Structure formats: structure tokens, C-alpha cells
Amino acid sequence: MLIRWKSKDKSSSSTSSSSSTSKKKRKGRESEDDWQNDKSNRNQPTDQAIDDRRRSARSREDPRRHTLGGDMLQWHKECPHALTIARLSYFHSPFCLYPLLPQQTPQMRVYTPTNQGPLFDDDPGIMSEAETASTGFRRGGKQRSSLPVVRTPSKTLERPLGLVFLQYRSETKRALLPNEITSIDTVRALFVRSFPRQLTMQYLEGPNVKIYIHDSSKDMFYELEDVRSHLREIRDRSVLRLFESNEVSAPQVLPGGQNIPQPLQPAAIPNQWDQEQSYFSEPEFDSEYQHQHIHKSKQPTKTPYYVGTTQTLPRGMYSDRTKGAIDGYMSSPERSGASRGAYEEPYYSQYGTRSATVTPIIDEEQGDISIADDQYAMYGVKNVGRIPRVPPNQMYDHTRSEDLHRIRVEHMERQLANLTGLVQKALTQNPQLPLVNNSPNILNIPGQYRNAEATGDGTVCTREKPPKLGKSTCHKSVSFEKSVSFSDDIQGVPKSHSPQHSADTKPPKPAIKSSTLPRTSSQERDRLKPPPPPKPLVMIAGNQYRTDLTLAPEVYNQLRGLQKKAMDLRTEVRTLRRLTQTQAVAVREDIKDTFMRIRATLLSNSGFVWGQGDKERTNLTREEEIYKQEVIRLEKDLADLESSVEGLRGEVINRRTRVNMVAVEDMALVLSRASKTVAELKMRFPVLQQGLRNLISNEMEHVCREEAFLKDEPDRLENALRRCKKLTGTLVTLKRLASVQEQRLPIPDTAGTDETIKPPETHNNVNKPIPSPRLGTVVASGGIAPENALDALLDXXXXXXXXAALHHADAHRPDDSTSDDSSQTLQNSITTKISQSQLYPSEPVSSNVGLRRLHSYPSGSDTDTSPPQPTRPTTGKPPVPERNAELLSKVNNKRVPPPPPPRTSSRSPLASPTSPHVPQHHRGQQQQQPAVTLSDCEQQQRTSEGTDSGSESVCSDNSQRQLALELRHQELLKKQRQLQEQYQRLQQMSKNAVPLAPTTMNHDIKKTGSESNLPLKMGYNMTVSGSMKNLCGGSGDPTLPFDPSQGSVANNVDHQDGGGSDSSTGGPNSLDGVAIGANGSVGTLPPHLTKTTNKVYETDIL
């Protein structure tokens, strides 16, 4: 803006001039009120400010046409005295600089208007605030809209009012043109007034904001300079466009226009040293006073230049200005190259300041020198020629670190996009020799410094250079990315607009072809997004120059590698984005499905989880609350009514006052309403009472059930525990009994009785669980596995005692000629838990087999004096298969056949007293008891087969088993007769009661397993077989009665000899010797039967 400095004596001019000034000021105030109508978000001037303005109008001779100030009202309310201090301290500020001085001199206190050229005489009516500060003029901190005072203008500037179209980003608004536009600040004020929530004057004064005007004749956009020739071009229906070269610093939407956010770019902010001093804005130091408007920036002492938190000074803002003024003409007060400050950030080096040269044609490239510098600065490479200047007291502001970090990230993304386009462009070119262009306007740019605009045919499109108007190293032209457009066309190469002026004269206006500008926003917004890379330029037919680059193979390969990396990165980013979207959709679907499942579960289980009683309880609670609230309201109304009635009654009685009918009617109305409420509540109470009673009864039942549960549950658990113990004892007893019965007693089978071979019906019950097969079976080579867990536990307890008893029994075993046959037969059959070889370790086949279960096998000897028993042939008998669950399942539904032949002991496989050499004189008397007893024993044995059949495996097929059963049936028919005779002999011997000699008993004992105490066990009423026929001679009472029909195990076990037993026996209740009664129950045999009976077993149960 043009500035006229006036001397002090001019202030005392004629009063007519002063009166005309007053008139003009009044007109200006009326017009300004018109301009201020829609600016509700800006502060209004105070009375003090208006008074100051009037005094300032009287104190000047010439009308002051226009100056610019900031939003100062809010700050002026806080610090009204700071403005005077700021103005007085201006000349003491180190920022009062002169561009032509070689150094900054803070001692320069006096302003000498050197260098005042003829441009100062353009308009005699302009006065600066610096002049008013020197003359003691105070404006009182009035907030001004920067619009000119509407008054009678100069004849040269007179123009009619009109409209102007203002465009900012994607918005377009109309504004009323003022009578005159004296400076570009007026245009900025138009923008601020049209966009109050987006723009501020401080932001528009920044170095990154430009205003362009549209030239419809050339379809160009020229940059609007702060010169009269440019400002006169703003006519009716002109289009003005605001362009931001760095959109990240654009202020956001302002709430009410008061709380102005700080821009993100480095701002001109004084530090603590100069906050108390006023300083001029950036344009005052960057131009050469050809067209300068010095104005004070009325900012608060504690509020920075951009209202917000404290920030540092912009880089190099007050550095050496000699370089910026060497070449003469400066295009704009906002544009001067500046060295970087101490906290230099290379990412902002090309965005923080603007070039000191004019930008006649907005070019994509930035010039031959500045492009290289800026590109190096973009990648963090400091240029050697740029020496950082440290301002005197510049302080680092940590509050901007987060914003700086975000901007750095955005700029890095932009660099990636630029690099991608650069590589793509370089690779699409043909490596040819560069064209030698003699024209100085042809811009030949190294390929590695060019922006990414590759053409379709592989050529590089360059445009004219901007004229070199004294460009120095720290100057740069406006980049193409700072352009704006109204056109819908794709951005391409702008048409060349050659300047018609030389570098000596005034420079041409900056122009932008409107077809090359983006439609709604600057290119900066698009460049902030890394993907996709910049689009290649579209080839346009005219005004293009072709130049080619010669690339070395290494550079070409590097560019190819960079292109590949960029493509990979782009693909990866695209893949990651797709994966993220897919995962987001999947997560949303999962959350939705989970919610639906939870909801369905709650709805389905609402009757069980919450229960119907809960709904009833909720309803009752709500009704009870409503009832209580109504009762409280009723009581309050009644209390108020009673107090009112009592007060009225007292006044009537005591003061003899008249009764007001209206008051009585009101009280009657309240009483009527209360009576109706009482009646309604009385009707509702029984229902509520019944519901609450039902609820209480239900809760009481629930409580009683819970108490009964808490009381009875311990007893129930104890009872269950006792039952478990009882069942455990019973099962142990039955297991031992099954171990005894599974020895397959040879039971004679009478042809007339079917029950001797028919199994009990109870064992064919379908509810009986089929036992699992035994865990181990005997093999011919050795290794025996325990039958089940209980056997294994009991076996571990008596392993040592069993081995000692085995060796002790071997010493007393008599020679037997039939042991080989019986042992071989047993080994071939493999039907029990232990083989015959365990009992006779002299056999080489089974001598190494460990002793697990000790069994006694029947012996064929009667007494010591009996004649030798002939052996019966056993070679015709097939091996007996083991019984298991599979076999049991086959025979459960059919008649169980007789068991296989018994395993015999050392005397003879089937030797008995009924052999041909034994006298048969008692045979006719033994026809009842043994048949019944042993038939039941066979029945129990078959029962035992059903219960313990899971321990053996099948060793032969069904045909062999059928043959064995037939042979066994025949043998049993014969044995039945033999047993009858034997029983008669036993009866005769019991009558005689002949005791046996203990010496012969001990001599003929056959000890198997832990049978060392068998003479003591004879008090258990065992029926001994084999060579143990004399064991009972010295043991208990021989006349102990035996009742086969007792149905239970005799309780005199362990009482015949004081209860002496081996540790391997089952204790007092071990059933070492049992007999089966006629009714199938277990009973103990009398001891005198043990002297002659051959087929009774002694078994040591582990």
C-alpha cells in the first residue's frame, strides 16, 4: 500500500478540511454499519473506541482512507494500555528494518524516510499508523473490518458500486464492492466478511495465501498484487479466488469467529523478549517501500500473532534482507526469500516462505536453481548456500510438536507420491540426447528434480521459465501446486502466456490458465494423499516443447528399482486396505451374530432365568411405587388443606373476618379431589394387597425350600456315602466269592434235574452290565497282568509273602505222576489268571511265571492209606476257552452248557474215592446231599462265569467247545454216581469220627501259595481237596455242625483257632473255604468233611 509520511506541522491545518473530514467520517460510519450488518460474529467497538476514532478524525488534516488492524477488542479489554506502549516501542524494536541496510541494527531508533520514490506521490490521502504513532494519535484499539470508509473518493478512484464474486475452496459468495479499493487488505477484508467462520485477517496476511483475479478475455487467473494498477481491475462482476499454497495451515471452522485456531505453518510470533514491543507484519520488511503500507499489528501482549498458544518466529523472517532487495523489484509485500531459522525443518522449507520474485506465469517447476534447492530441502538436504540464521531470542515451542509431526507425515506421503510419479515419468522416456535450446525461456530441468508429469508418448512437457527478475538462491517461484482453477478440465500443461514486459520494467501480472486449475480446491489437498500418484499430463497440441533426458544405465536401473518398490508399496497398501475393510466387515458381522445369539438366548431362557415371578414382582413393585406416590401426594394435599382450613377458621373466630367464598370453593375443590383420590386408592389397595401377599407367600415357600435344602442336604450326602460304603463291601465280598467259584467245581449232572445245568435267571437280567474283559490273561511264556485295579492293589500288598509261601509249598509237594499231564493240559487251555505251572515250579515251561493269584486244585486222594489211584486219560479233552464278555453275550439268551472239566491236582486229574480200586460199599447211601450241594455249586460256578467272564479270552472255536461240552456231560453223569457213593462214605465216617494223625497230615499237605497256615485255617470249615485231606486233624472242633440251608456265610470264621491267618488272606471275612447249600446260598462245611472229600478247594484270595 502506498504510504505518505507527513510532518508534524501538517496536523495543524485548516478547520474546513477538518470539518470535511468529519463529514466523510460520518458517512464512513454509516456505510461501515451497512458492511457490518451480517458480521454478527465479530466484536463491536466500544464507546471508548468510538471516542478515540472521533478524536483521531479531528486530529488529522487529511482524511485517513484505510488502514488494517486485527481483532483487538477482546485483547484491548484486557490490556487497554498496551497499544500505546506498543506504538511507542515501535521505533525501539529491532524489527524496524530497512531492506537496503547491510545488517540488522537494533540501535537504529530514528526512522529516516530514505528511498522515498515517486510511488509515494500517487495518492496524497493515505496515512499510515506509524505516522499516527509518531504524532501521538491513539485509535483506542478499535476492531476494524478493514473496509474503507465510504466517502467522496478521489476523482481518479471514483467508480460505481457493484458485485464481486469471492471463491474460497468449494464455496462461492457474492460481496458488495466498496467505493474504492485502496489496498489488497480491502480485498482480504471482503473475504473475511464473506467467510467469517473460515478466514481471518491474520491468516490472509500469511505468506501462504494468495488472491487471484480472473481475466475473462484471456481465460487466465492473475495473481492480484498490491498495486493500484491491479486493484483497479477489480470491477463489477469480477471473480476473485483465494488460494492456499499450504492447506494444512488453513484455519478450521471458527466457532463464532472469536476463538481463532492457530495455523499450522510457522507464524510470525514474537517471543518473550519482544512481546511487550510492537512490530510490523511481514509485508513491511519484505518490500522496498515502492508500494508499502506500514501498519501496526495490534496483537495482545500475551497473545501471539496468530491467536493461540505461543509459537516461535517463522524461519528467517527477520533475517538479512539484502539478498531479497538486490535485484530491485519486489512483486508483493508477502513475498521475500528468507533464510531458515535455528529450528529449521526441511519438510517445511518449500512451504514456509514465499519467493521474493514475481511469478508472471505459475509454473509447475520452480526454476533452475530453486528447484534443486527445494527438492533437496524436501528430502532433508540442507543447501550449502543457505546458512541458517538464528533470531536473537527464538525459543522452541513444544506445543507444536504434535502438529509438526502430523505435517511431517503428510509431507512424507507427498514425497512418496512425487517420487512415484518421478520414477514413472523417467522410465517412460526414450534416452536421447537433450535438445539444445537457445531460447532463454525454455526450461530444461534435470529429470531427477522434476515433478511427476509423464506424457503419453514419453516426452517431458516443460513450460516457459519465469523471467529472472533478480532471483537469488533463497528466492523461488510459486509452484504449480499452488494454483487454483474454476475449470472442469483435467489438469494439464498450461498454455504459455508470455510476458510482454522485460525484466527492467514493471513485471507482468502472474497468470494461471483457468483450465489448468483444480475446480474446488487447490492441488495441495490432492497432494496430501499419497495414493494414487499424480496423473500424467495430457498432451495438448500447441505451445509445447520437447526435451529428452539421457540417463545412465545405473540411474535407469535405480529408477526401475524405485518404480518397482513404489508399485509393491502401492499394492501392499491396497491389499492392507482391502484386508482392513474385510476384517472390519467380519468384525461387524461377528458382533452382530453374537448379539443376536445373546438376545435369542436371553429371550429363550427368560422364563427360566428371570422366571415368571420376576415379571410379577416387577409389576407389583411398579404398582406399589405408584400407589405410594399417590398416597404421599394425597397426604400432602390433605395437610395443606387442613392448615388452610384451620387458618381460615382461626381468622373467622379470632379476628371476626369475613369469609371469602372463592377461597372456600377452592378448598372444597381440593377436598373433593382428595376424596376421589382416597376412594380410588381404597379400590386399588385390595388388588395390590393380594398381589403382595401372593408374592410374599411365594417368597416364603422359596425360603422354606431353601432352608429345607440346607438342612436336609448334609444328611442326604451322609446317607449316600454310607450306601456307597455298604455297596463297596458287598462288591468286595461278591468278588471274593466269584474268585472261589471260578475254579470250575466238577458237579455231577443228573439227567432228571434241569436246574443243575440251567443258570439262574437273575444273571440273565438285561439290566446287568456286561463286565469288560479282564485286563490280562495267562500266556504260556509268563507275564501276567492284573485282572483289574482292585486285584492289582491287593496283589501289591502280598507279593513278597506269596513268593515265600510258594517256595515253602514246593518243599511239601509229594511226587505225582500225573502232574505232567494236568500241567500240560492247563497250560494249553489258558483259562484262569494263573497257570498250573505256578503251583509246580519244577515244570520248565512255567517256572518263571510270577505268582499273582493262588488257587487250589482238586486232588484225587482220599487218605494216606488209600490205594494208588489210576490216572484217567485226559488227552481227548480239548483246551477250555476263557470266558469273556463276548462269550457271555452269546450265551446269555440261551441255555448255558455245563462247565469244562476241572483242573486236577497232583494225584490224578479225576481221581476220586469211587475209582475201581476204591471200595464201593457206601455208594448207595450218598444219593442226596452231595448232589444237591454240588449241583448248586455248579450253578454258582456258572453264575460266576457270567460275572467274571470278562477276564478270559476265547481260545477255540465253537465246534471244539461243543465237543468239549458233550464229553464233559458224559463225565459229569459218571461223577454224579461217584459223588453219591463218596457222600455215603462221608456219612459213615462222620458217625465214627475217627481223628487223623497230625504227622500224616503235615506230611501230605500240598501248599500252594500262602498256605503255610492251612492247619490253622481248618477252623474256618474249609473243604480241602488234593493232598490237603488231613489238614483238619488238629484244628478246631470236628463236630462243628453244618447246615446247608443256612443261606449265609457262617459267622464263626476265624474263631476256631483264634483267628490266625496269613496276610495274604482276605481277613476275617475271607471265604477261603465255602460250600453251596441246597438253596444256592453260601455256607461253611463242617471240618470232618475235609478228611474224605476230594473236590473241595482251598483258595487264597488276594
UniProtKB/Swiss-Prot annotation:
Gene3D superfamilies: Actin interacting protein 3, C-terminal domain. Residues 867-881 have a biased composition (Pro residues). GO terms for cellular component: cytoplasm. Keywords: Coiled coil. Residues 12-21, 904-918 have a biased composition (Low complexity). The keyword Coiled coil applies. Residues 832-849, 936-958 have a biased composition (Polar residues). The keyword Phosphoprotein does not apply. Residues 1-69, 295-318, 450-475, 489-539, 745-774, 832-958, 1031-1087 are annotated as: Disordered. Disulfide bonds: none annotated. Pfam families: AIP3. Residues 405-430, 554-579, 614-654 form a coiled coil. Residues 1-11, 50-65 have a biased composition (Basic and acidic residues). This is Coiled-coil domain-containing protein AGAP005037. It comes from Anopheles gambiae (African malaria mosquito).
